[in-house]
Amino acid sequence: MAPPPSLAGLQVEATAFPPSVKPPGSSNTLFLGGAGVRGLEIQGNFVKFTAIGVYLEDNAVPLLAVKWKGKTAEELSESVEFFRDIVTGPFEKFIQVTTILPLTGQQYSEKVSENCVAFWKSVGIYTDAEGKAIEKFIEVFKDQNFPPGASILFTQSPKGSLTICFSKDASVPEAANAVIENKLLSEAVLESILGKHGVSPAAKRSLAARLSELLNGCK
């Protein structure tokens, strides 16, 4: 087994993302692939809503290296296919979304659901099973509120489950709030961040830069 990737942690606004984390619902320690803000241009100002960190299982590096070794950070950051390979790859992923501005669970889940459904419809894979998974996703968030500094945590298993946790700060709890067994929903949550229309270009650039370095160091 290759030694785990050695990358530093990252600071995004007030949130410090550690270099590695053991996610809820997992027995593995994952490394920090990249992190960045999610924001929107509002009346000429860039308003930052959340800080997002994306962690990957160690075996992501050799698996991605087969196709992507030798590419520059810029080439990776502009490749829709590269991020699709991260989203659908057979390795665990963990996503930490920490709020910068206050957010209700309803606001968050409705926006994520909207992005997931739009993606599924664009690729023609929306079925009743996905509809039910979305209903469950919205239900999990219904009574939640996220003041600044609170976190929403997703663990994605390659087998298809999505483990959801909430934390009042940036710490990672051991127990899950919910587990949804739907592979397409699990992937779509990350797709909504890293995909072609992903909500965090900053996290995509960070992932591309850090992974380019790791992939090019692959033997």
From Swiss-Prot:
Catalytic activity: a chalcone = a flavanone
Native source organism of the sequence: Pyrus communis
Pfam families reported for this sequence: Chalcone
Domain of life from the UniProt record: Eukaryota
Transmembrane residue ranges: none
Positions of substrate binding: 50, 115, 192
Keyword annotations: Flavonoid biosynthesis, Isomerase
Disulfide-bond pairs as recorded: none
Function: Catalyzes the intramolecular cyclization of bicyclic chalcones into tricyclic (S)-flavanones. Responsible for the isomerization of 4,2',4',6'-tetrahydroxychalcone (also termed chalcone) into naringenin.
EC number: 5.5.1.6
Annotated PANTHER family: CHALCONE--FLAVANONE ISOMERASE 1-RELATED, CHALCONE--FLAVONONE ISOMERASE 1-RELATED
Any one Gene Ontology BP term: flavonoid biosynthetic process
Enzyme class per UniProt: isomerase
Family to which this protein belongs: Belongs to the chalcone isomerase family.
Metabolic or biological pathway, per its Swiss-Prot or TrEMBL entry: Secondary metabolite biosynthesis; flavonoid biosynthesis
This protein's record includes keyword Isomerase: yes
Annotated site, Important for catalytic activity, chain positions: 108
One MF term in the entry's GO annotations: chalcone isomerase activity
Stretch forming the signal peptide: none
More info: Part of the biosynthetic pathway for all classes of flavonoids, a large class of secondary plant metabolites, many of which are brightly colored.
UniProt protein name: Chalcone--flavanone isomerase
